[in-house]
Amino acid sequence: MDILNDISIAAPEALLIGVALIGVLLGATFKQSFNGLSRLLGALALAGAAFLAASQSAVDASTAFNGLYKVTPFIAIAKAVSYGVGAIALLVAGGYLHRENMNKFEYTLLVMFGSAGMGVMLSANNLMTLYMGIETLSLSSYVLAAFNRDSRRSAEAGLKYFVLGALASGLLLFGCSLVYGYTGFASFEQIAAADQSIGLTFGLVLILMALSFKASAAPFHVWTPDVYEGAPTPVVTFFSTAPKLATVAVLANIMFTVFGVYEESWMLIIAIVSAISMLVGAFGGLAQNNIKRLLAYSSIANVGYALMGVAAGEVNGAASVLTYMTIYVITTLGMFGIVLAMRRRDGQVEEISDLNGLSTSRPGLAVAMTVLVFSVAGIPPMAGFLGKWVVFEAALKSELYWLVAVGVIGSVVSLGYYLRLIWAMWAKTSDEEALEPADGMVSVSIYGATILAFPVLVIWIGWMTGIIGTAAAAG
């Protein structure tokens, strides 16, 4: 039957939605006794969805639901990485949620529904499917940002994110309406084959602006530092990894497949957004003392580097974007694991000064942080350097020499705040009590990410790059 075939194509999202709905029933029935089990159930569902998505990367492109839904090898890999990282982000949240009186089963359900939204927007083959997926992710994210009801900062973060996110959603809907109005089609294939027009160009620009907001690209980044600082740390761990990769992958996929004929127009726009993001992220982070705000500016800069691959266009650009974002989210997961591990008996700490003397009190954590910082900064021979090399190479092949120069400048400037973290850990001393031991899953995420970023083991990137390159070429 066609419906069974359609569901098999959308199997990862069907699994997530099905388990989430079962979770709603179990949570309503067993209430508090289901809180801890819900995270394990959600993580298993996300891991299962990642496995199903990975299995789809080896098959040809396929569509479902009368062309509303499409899966290609490129999309399947983006889904697999997003779901896998989301599962880890859910597991590391347990200790924090328990200590902060946030251990509610609704947290897991919101992450699962948001992850299902990621999958829908990645597989969208129609304007309305795209909008539905993005809004499913966004609505879950707004609630997650304000999930700590006892924190004024969390409520403020959720409100800011909601208000500005609603504006971006309006831009997206307006852009979609312009594209539909000037082409008469909502299907991506039909839009790609439609005649060019000025109205379609305006619609493209509005869609690009909305997706840039969702990805935290400058100059649409203003919500990011405040939300990262105010939202609970496990929520920010999720925000900064899985949805970030999914949004950038969606942007790349739409630009390459739907608006490919407008390449000369949007390549310049994305190149400018990339340059602004790299510079804003580099210079904005210099003045930060809060680690979460610093990592917010780091994420803005790193989205700029990923968009360099989008601006490069074609297959090399698509492969470089997904390679870079995969390395970035793994490294970021480890860094936020360290932020989760930064707690004393009186609660969480998240200032740079709280890292003072870490090399003496917690040498293993200091070494891990050093490796991860060097990786996200792009210092050779860490994994992050190879990620930047891939996007720089793609930009050079497209003769975007000025953009590569901006990227180099941004990388050098951003070393200023990355090295502040290293200096605090290794050169300063502290009279404060030592940090408490990290939770088990937090330690696993920290040292797992450190191992993947370590020079001896970056050979996995060559294997991954080959797979992603093949997937990008196939679809």
From Swiss-Prot:
Pfam families: Proton_antipo_M
UniProt GO MF annotations: NADH dehydrogenase (ubiquinone) activity; NADH:ubiquinone reductase (non-electrogenic) activity; quinone binding
Alphabetic keyword roster: Cell inner membrane, Cell membrane, Membrane, NAD, Quinone, Translocase, Transmembrane, Transmembrane helix, Transport, Ubiquinone
Annotated coiled-coil segments of the chain: none
GO terms of biological process kind: ATP synthesis coupled electron transport
Catalysed reaction, written as an equation: a quinone + NADH + 5 H(+)(in) = a quinol + NAD(+) + 4 H(+)(out)
Annotated family: Belongs to the complex I subunit 2 family.
Protein name as catalogued: NADH-quinone oxidoreductase subunit N
Lineage: Bacteria, Pseudomonadati, Pseudomonadota, Alphaproteobacteria, Hyphomonadales
